[in-house]
């Protein structure tokens, strides 16, 4: 699941999926999202700047993403990005004359009403090597439809390909039933012919097959 989530997040935040060199061949899949569906803010327009207009940005991007007949209903972002948005002066201005208690729920609902989309905060974490990082990166906002965005496709890993080509040598690899995934036990250290430690290596290769290439928008906002 972690691999699938990470691959999906890479696609949704960059329109690319890059596989680690160790078990994914170091390859990058570029889905070639049209330039009109991407924007990188700079200078006084980044959302951390007082001069930014994040609500107008979101409305403008929604219009662009819907030009070809699609319907964009969700603004996807990390928790840090949403916090930056809701603390911006243009958002605070929405509550200047309010007499009710301003709660986080009210702030989110008000922003959603203004931009015409639901804000979805993706705050999942993943461990890559020894580093824990966000599955969906900060400073990126992706507008998407509500519903199925495509499917996840599974394929043979480099190890499985070696097996199919008869190039495994003396490596002992076991298939996980019903999948392209493999399990390999690799000796990590040994002395006097006795194995002291082993690594159990499970490989899996999964990529998104999206159906939203003409109804999404990826913005880098900081």
Regions from the language model: what does each represent?
Residues 1-2:
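Long, hydrophobic/aromatic-enriched structural stretches that serve as scaffold segments
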Residues 6, 11, 31, 37, ...:
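Sequence-level detector for tyrosine residue identity
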Residues 6-25:
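Short, glycine/acidic-rich hinge or "gate" loops at secondary-structure transitions
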Residues 25-104:
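Extended, solvent-exposed, turn-rich assembly/linker loops in the middle of proteins
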Residues 92-222:
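Sequence/fold signature of self-assembling virion shell proteins
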